[in-house]
Amino acid sequence: DVITGESSGVVIKSTSTDFVVGDTVAAHMGWQSHLVANADDPRLMKVDLDNGSLSAHLGVVGMPGRTAYFGLTEVGKPQPGETLVVAAASGAVGSAVGQIAKIKGLRAVGIAGGPEKCRYVKEELKFDACIDYKADNFAAELAAACPDGVDIYFENVGGDVTKAVALLLNPGARVPICGYISNYNDEDIANSQTPMRILKGLDPEPENRFFVVTEWRDRWVEATRQLGSWIQDGRLKYRESIGVDLESAPKYFRGMLKGKNFGKQLIKVADED
C-alpha cells in the first residue's frame, strides 16, 4: 500500500477538459512519483502559483496553512489584545498560527526546541517571544512571557509543554487541539498525558476540542487566497526543509517526529519539467 500524504505536481497527461497538460495541482496522492486520478476526485485541486510555489501549496498555503488559519480563527476565536501561545512554533502549522495571530492583533508567544529555532521565531517571524522548552527554567520563562495569562493555546505537542501552559490559562481560554506529537510514540497511549486528559483535570476545564482541517473543506479556496495575499504582503513568512528522492522519505519522516526539521518537511521526487 502507498503511504498516505499530500503532494503537488504537474499534469503530464489528461483526457479531461477540467485538467489539461501543464496544469499545476495538489492531490492526496501519497508517497509516490505519479498518480492516476479522476477529475472529480475532491482531493485533487488546481493550484494558483500566484498564491505560492508548488512546495508552498504543501505548506503555508496548503494543508498546514489552512490548518493554522481555520484552527485559530474558527476554534481559537481570537480577539485583539489577547495572548496566544503556540507549541512547535517553528514548524509549518505553528509558524503560521503565530503570524496570523499577530495579523489579528494578538500577542504571540511561541514554544520551540533550541536557541536557533527560537531565534528564528522571534527575529524572522516577529513573534513577541519564543521560549525554549528544552531549557531548565522553561516554565518560569513561559510565565514571564505571558504576564497577562494565556487566552488561546494552539496545541501541537502535549505532555509537559501542555502542563506548563495549562497553569497559565485564563478564564474563558480556548484550546484548539491540532495534534500532540510528544504522545505519538507512547507505548501506553491510553494512559499518556494527552492534552485532553491534562485539560480535563483543570477546574474549570477550558473550552477545547480536537479538530481536522477537512471540517472546512468548502472554504479551502478562501483560506488559500488569504494566506497567499499575506505572503505577497510580506506579513506571512515560511521556511521549508526539502529532502531529495522518495527513497529518503522514511529518514526525513523519522527526523520530523524528533524535531529535526526546520519548517515544513518535504521530499522532492522530480523536477517540475
Feature map (PLM): residue ranges:
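Mid-domain Rossmann-like dinucleotide-binding core that forms the NAD(H)/NADP(H) cofactor-binding site
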Residues: L58-D136
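Glycine-rich phosphate-binding loop and adjacent beta-alpha segment
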Residues: K104, D160-L236, V269-D273
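A structural motif shared across PLP-dependent enzymes of the aminotransferase-like
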Residues: H28-R43, R219
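Short amphipathic alpha-helix with an adjacent loop that forms part of the alpha/beta core around
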Residues: N137-D148
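C-terminal capping/lid region of NAD(P)-dependent oxidoreductase domains
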Residues: D233-I242, P250-D273
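Short, well-ordered loop/turn sites that connect or cap secondary structure elements
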Residues: D18-F19, P78, L169, N191
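Glycine-rich beta-strand-centered segment in the early N-terminal region that forms part
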Residues: D1-W31
